[in-house]
From Swiss-Prot:
Residues 1-23 form the signal peptide. Residues 24-559 are extracellular. It is a multi-pass membrane protein. It comes from Haloferax sp. (strain Q22). Homotrimer stabilized by interdomain contacts and numerous Ca(2+) and Na(+) ions. The chain crosses the membrane at residues 560-580, 601-621, 622-642. One of its GO terms (cellular component) is cell surface. Keywords: Calcium, Cell membrane, Disulfide bond, Membrane, Metal-binding, Signal, Transmembrane, Transmembrane helix. This is Fusexin 1. It is found in: Cell surface; Cell membrane. GO terms for biological process: plasma membrane fusion. Exhibits fusogenic activity. Mediates cell-cell fusion in mammalian cells (bilateral fusion). The gene is fsx1.
Amino acid sequence: MKNGLKASVVALFFLLAASSASAATNSVDTVTYESNSDFFDGQVLQVGYTSNFATDKINVYLSESKIESETGAVADEPITFDVSHQNTYAKYPTQDTGLESITGWDAVKKTVSSKQELWDWTTTNCVDTNDAGTFTVDGYGTTDVDARANRWFDTWTGQYKYTIYCWQRNDYYGAVADIGSPDEVFRTEWRLQAGDKNPQTAVITNGDGGTGVTSNLGRYAKVSWEGSLSTGENPPLVDDEYALHSNDYEGGWRVISESRYSSYQSFVQNNADDLLGEWGAGLTTESHIESEMNGKAEEAASEFTESPLSDSEILDSSFQNGAFKLDMERSLMYPEFSVYVDAGENGYATISKPVGKPEIVSTSGAEFGELGQGTISVEAENVGDSEGSFSARTDSCGEYFSGNSLQDTQRVSPGGTASFDFRVTFTSTSMTQSEFSDQCEVVVEDTGSGNEVSASVSVTATQEDECTEGDETKKEKQVNGETVDVIMSCTNGLKLEEDEVCSADEEARYIDDDVQYECRDKDSPPGGGGGDPWTIPGLGWQLDTPFGGMEKALSGNAGALTWAQLLLSFIGFLAGFALVGVKLGKMVDGLATEFIPLSDAVVRLGIGLVGGGMAFMAVYQLVTNPLGFLLTVVGLLLTGYLYLKGTTPDINL
């Protein structure tokens, strides 16, 4: 047995036969080596054939050299296909459509003495010949049978009597069925042989199958009907034929004329009752009306010799599944078959082809964070005897991971290698930061042979904290060997990112719900403040500035605490303005007006604004500290109490 992968053989035949020519065809048009079939493991040898339109027999011989020259595959023995002994016919099924049976007729007469006897005898012994007619007996209702009755007086008995005239059925010609449209049926004998091995044979008919149906051709091959059968002639249509069923006929069936049957039915329905009336009136005889009715029945049941089905065979004699068989004059035309031959390691035919064989020699995993992506790689070596065409794909990845499997095919010489890279992404619904590790399976395949190998590659991804956009928090990290605070900000609702890194002398301090965190000197007074701190030049002292609180107050976003801080600071401003502007203003009035040409009021206003501003800043520094705020409020309440106590006059009653 040759080295390499074993193959399955597919023989695809287009049997194109016209008229009844009997020339045999023994060549093929195409031989290709393709992918696996659905029936046997291994590669597929496809043999395609197109007829010269003048054959009803196929006798194809595929030598070892023919197979190798067309495909590069090596065969240990020749393969032959024979298709012969065609038999084609049209099958006409019968159909029960509720048609009335054909029978003989007896005209009967009966004399009774009462209306009750008339009713009883008529409904029991007479038949209906006209579906639309009814027979009425006064005082006893109606019946759907057809009958005539004469009432007369019997002088011998002195009573009125009734004479009844009606029809009864006698001879049974048979049940009538419709004939359906014909189905073409063919029968061919197949024979396949590899070298001197036992031949594989089968009889293929489209009556047993149809498009997409597969039959066994012995143990090691299959024949599939793939096309539509035609002989180049249309089976005769049945436009004036019915089928009559009775055990008296050969095969249980007889072909009759539809028009004769319709004439019989029309005569019975339209004339049977009138014939009874003529007989009862004495205008004709019993034998005459029976001859009229039975003549129509015999004519309807007679064989329709003018029909093309008069020479047909009976395929099924039962009434439920009856069928006629009509042989066709022409041979098959345009049937299409596929033959699949097992040529694997333990198969029927021995065929092999050198191919590439991949082997994964190295892999490279990936580590990345959420919203990012990583790259995994595999390197495959061709350890086969022939050039290979390698492709790779990510077959599957663990939970939360997905891989991009689109890859270009690479041709690899024996002993050569090819590298394949795959982009891997990570998505998780977890809300907390954690690390996920899993694997992706990568498959490398030689496209020519179907040989494939796989390897598992490690992937690791870090799940970031999910957050509310705009929120800030603080964390610690090492910078130059020192632990510092880092202000983290949520900018996109998915992850926290570094917003500001504090120095070693600073700390991330929470200010309020709007400002949130700021880097402040560790030695600065505690408290939030309302904006960026101001550093006093030369001293390095940091002061809380009120501008942030004022901005919030003006925009309507200030809370109760901010309003209280600004109000207390404004009281400090008024106190500073009054004390400094009045007291200190008097001291500098003369000095200022001596050197500066300004009025005393303007000087006092300027000095008061400076003093008030300094008082405002001093109070603001105090009240932005929680303890200072509390002491300020308590001090104001105590001062107010003492002021009221000292200024309120005593009232003596």
